[in-house]
Amino acid sequence: MARLTILIAFVAALVLVVHTSAFRDEQSCKKQLQHSEKHQEDCFPRIKNVIGRSGSSGKKSEKLGQCCEILSDLSEGCQCRALQPVMEKYCYSEAK
């Protein structure tokens, strides 16, 4: 009976640790997304401006590349992939 009680307590503790870890990851992801909003506000107008202009100079391509790198870093850091559609729209499809 004591072994069963210890086993149940161990499983409950393990579930609690896993749940807490998942909650922290979710909170971290939310913080990263909030942080990314600032970068998005900075980058999106520049990306749209670069894409909207005809022709491509080295300077324009460099700015677009920098913004896409920032978005890439943010999406890799946050596992919820909320930035993937943004990257596909601004960095992959229209930039080519």
UniProtKB/Swiss-Prot annotation:
GO terms for cellular component: endoplasmic reticulum. It comes from the Eukaryota. Residues 1-22 form the signal peptide. Disulfide bonds join C29-C78, C80-C91. It is found in: Endoplasmic reticulum. Keywords: Allergen, Disulfide bond, Endoplasmic reticulum, Signal. InterPro entries: Bifun_inhib/LTP/seed_sf. Gene3D superfamilies: Plant lipid-transfer and hydrophobic proteins. Belongs to the 2S seed storage albumins family. This is Conglutin delta 4.
